[in-house]
């Protein structure tokens, strides 16, 4: 659960430098308690806390789950990024406590490395996640305004992470990004890219992209 799409747009849009001003604004306010947002369906207001985030993911039955965090857009300044990172660290500890209180061994919790595009903040966040009792580590937060910057952030972050935990790259899954991530030591990825292509009649095959929507169905 990243408090990002509620207010800032998608990670893909950020990497491409797009800002969709026509999207309904569902995020109302982020506080120490959690994120208050409005349903785009009926306008009902909800409060998503770190504890509620873990409870929801537990009920979903996911094999690995993540702490609640705020994923800041790349264009915010370092002061805001630091403030957000510190709050996300506190949320991570609350998420960890909630998970431990109900852990039955069927799910694993990942902490999320924050810090945006600022290397010293990334180092600080990596130390925090390394030194707390998470099963795995997710590389999250803003990864930059371009693919090259994203690759640089991932590379420098991976160099700081402990080697005895699995590492997941949040929201990134382009073909070149996967190859780069694996080279850096990333174990798993998640991305809408394959299913988005499929919805539009495409598929990922060697050596690249294949258009299927005009092909006869057998």
Where are each of the predicted segments found?
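Non-catalytic, usually N-terminal nucleic-acid engagement modules in DNA/RNA processing proteins
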Residues: 1-103, 210, 214-215
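Glycine-rich phosphate/ribose-binding loops and adjacent secondary-structure elements
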Residues: 86-89, 102-218
């Amino acid at each position: 659960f990243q408090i990002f799409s509620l207010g800032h747009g998608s990670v893909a849009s950020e990497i491409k430098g797009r800002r969709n001003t026509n999207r309904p604004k569902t995020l109302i306010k982020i506080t120490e308690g959690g994120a208050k947002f409005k349903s785009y369906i009926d306008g009902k207001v909800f409060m998503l806390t770190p504890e509620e985030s873990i409870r929801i993911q537990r009920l979903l039955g996911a094999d690995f789950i993540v702490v609640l965090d705020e994923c800041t857009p790349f264009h915010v300044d370092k002061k805001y990024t630091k403030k957000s990172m510190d709050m996300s660290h506190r949320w991570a500890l609350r998420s960890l406590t909630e998970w431990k209180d109900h852990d039955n061994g069927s799910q694993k919790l990942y902490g999320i490395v924050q810090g945006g595009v600022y290397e010293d903040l990334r180092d600080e966040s990596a130390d925090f996640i390394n030194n707390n009792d998470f099963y795995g580590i997710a590389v999250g937060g803003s990864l930059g305004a371009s693919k090259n910057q994203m690759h640089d952030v991932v590379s420098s972050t991976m160099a700081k992470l402990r080697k005895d935990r699995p590492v997941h790259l949040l929201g990134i899954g382009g073909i070149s990004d996967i190859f780069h991530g694996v080279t850096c030591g990333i174990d798993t990825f998640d991305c809408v890219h394959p299913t988005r292509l499929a919805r539009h009649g495409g598929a990922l095959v060697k050596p690249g992209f294949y258009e299927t929507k005009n092909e006869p169905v057998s």
